[in-house]
Amino acid sequence: MAPLRVERAPGGSQLAVTSAQRPAALRLPPLLLLLLLLLLGAVSTSPESLNQSHPTEDSLLSKGKMEDYETNVLPCWYYYKTSMDSVKDWCNWTLISRYYSNLRYCLEYEADKFGLGFPNPLAESIILEAHLIHFANCSLVQPTFSDPPEDVLLAMIIAPICLIPFLVTLVVWRSKDGDAQA
């Protein structure tokens, strides 16, 4: 190990310096240096390389499950599509709710049967496709409000107008009585 000398820094504090003229505080044990290099190597890897997953047995099984799930839910989609084609008004929920609920139930049941979560990407794409095909032109129908009959409207306008002078008179009359008592 190199001998240490103590020197003063320009500000007046003492620094321990090795014979190689390096501050002793910067010397690191080899194990700590190796750990630091490993950490820097892990941090400097690109995020793209971290996101790449190598196919494992589970991921291949999951891919097989998704393919089987897709083949099992296609009849659900075809049944829904043919049922919806027979409906005249696609925007009337009472007419289409049964078919839509059956599609959703079928997608969820098949996902559960294959051990997949619901909603999953395939189920979401089928539901989105259903919305794009059948409900794209549907909008929320808001009831249009009309004016009340004239006699009700006049009563609602005249009542506050007549009430205001009476209330002003009452306030003025009560405030005069209050001043006289004080």
Curated annotation (Swiss-Prot):
Disulfide pattern: C76-C106, C91-C138
Chief site of localization: membrane
Topological domains, Extracellular: 46-150
Subcellular location: Cell membrane
Transmembrane segments: 151-172
Keywords for this protein: Cell membrane, Disulfide bond, Glycoprotein, Membrane, Receptor, Signal, Transmembrane, Transmembrane helix, Transport
Membrane disposition: Single-pass type I membrane protein
Any one GO CC term of the record: receptor complex
UniProt signal peptide: 1-45
InterPro entries, sorted: RAMP (IPR006985), RAMP_sf (IPR038126)
Molecular function GO terms recorded: adrenomedullin binding; adrenomedullin receptor activity; coreceptor activity; G protein-coupled receptor binding
Highest taxon above the source species: Eukaryota
Residues in the Cytoplasmic compartment per record: 173-182
GO terms of biological process kind: adenylate cyclase-activating G protein-coupled receptor signaling pathway; adherens junction assembly; adrenomedullin receptor signaling pathway; amylin receptor 2 signaling pathway; angiogenesis; basement membrane assembly; bicellular tight junction assembly; calcium ion transport
Site-annotated residues for Required for CALCRL interaction: S146
Residues bearing glycans: N51, N92, N137
Pfam families hit by this protein: RAMP
Subunit structure comment from the entry: Heterodimer of CALCRL and RAMP2; the interaction forms the receptor complex for adrenomedullin/ADM. Heterodimer of CALCR and RAMP2; interaction forms the AMYR2 receptor complex for calcitonin/CALC and amylin/IAPP.
Family: Belongs to the RAMP family.
Role summary: Accessory protein that interacts with and modulates the function of G-protein coupled receptors including calcitonin gene-related peptide type 1 receptor (CALCRL) and calcitonin receptor (CALCR). Required for the transport of CALCRL to the plasma membrane. Together with CALCRL, form a receptor complex for adrenomedullin/ADM. Together with CALCR, act as a receptor complex for calcitonin/CT/CALC. Together with CALCR, also act as a receptor complex for amylin/IAPP.
Protein's recorded name: Receptor activity-modifying protein 2
Source organism: Rattus norvegicus
